Amino acid sequence: MTLGLKKFLADNYGKRVIAGQTVTPGSNAEIDAITRETGRTPAMRTGDLMFCTPSKYEGTKEYADNEVAAALEWGRNGGIVSFGWHWYAPEGKSDYYADTSTFVLGDAVTDRDISMADDEELKTLQESGLISEQTVLLLKDIDAAAEVLDKFRGENIPVIFQPIPDGDSSMYWWGGSAENYKWLWKLMFQRMDKYHGLNNLIWVWNGSSGDYFPGEDYCDVIGQSFYENSPSPFAGRFSALAGMTDVPKLLAVTNCDRLPSPDYMRRDSAMWSWFSAGSGNCMITNNGELSEKYTSWQNLHDIYNSELCVTLDELPDFEEYAFQEE
């Protein structure tokens, strides 16, 4: 099914935009509100692995388990499953924001290739002083995230995976140093792809600066976040990202406050692969109703009922789609 989803994304690219929605962990509240108001349902459900790592899981077990269960059900019913990963730091004052976390990524960076090391080898390397405790803790978190993603592989459900976003913004503990960020990204990619065999992942790198780009071999899609309360398709940034690689990559709006207009995308030749609006008050009130804080009812209705917008009911069976002829 992963090949089928990749083929669908490639075939659809430049023609229509796929509707996605980020959800409150463990629920489909935002999606339910959109369906009620427009009669159409987002094709993509975007969750987050933030509660699934050891430093957070015990205190947020219900959220984490409900989130995984909801995403699995979404995938079983033919929807596109997507996960971000706002990674709570593995030690110290645990948060993902740099100004409230005490974790220092530079303390974990090593020149050694540890992507295939098992627990015993990691223990030996740490006891020998060849890698730090912080290095081991990072790998434990990556392994915990991989364990969650493996549940989807086991059910032949592809996952659009967009971890550690906006590294070039210095907002998060994984940002601030391009070299450290790229080291972490490549470690995570190799650990999940080679060590854990997660061949169901479609990798999305989110950022603006080429200095932080890990390389064409380490991602399938380049994503961008927009928090500018504008229906603009941001054609300038679309062009800039398109020029970042020699091998063309799909481009996507991985998070936004106000939904971009598909009509403007077509007008400006900036047809992103998908959009995914932010969760919570970006879309709904505390009562689960449409908030209209950023996107009005009329705009939401127009976007979701546009011929340029792909909704859940229009998705193919990805297993069959993989073998369809052009």
Regions inferred by a protein language model and the residue ranges of each:
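Substrate-binding cleft of secreted/luminal carbohydrate-active enzymes
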Residues: 17-22, 249-326
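Alpha-helical scaffolding within the catalytic cores
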Residues: 3-4, 26-34, 65-69, 144-148, ...
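Loop/turn elements at helix/coil->beta-strand transitions in domains of secreted/extracellular proteins
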Residues: 14-17, 40-43, 76-81, 154-160, ...
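Substrate-binding cleft of extracellular glycoside hydrolase catalytic domains
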Residues: 54-187, 194, 198
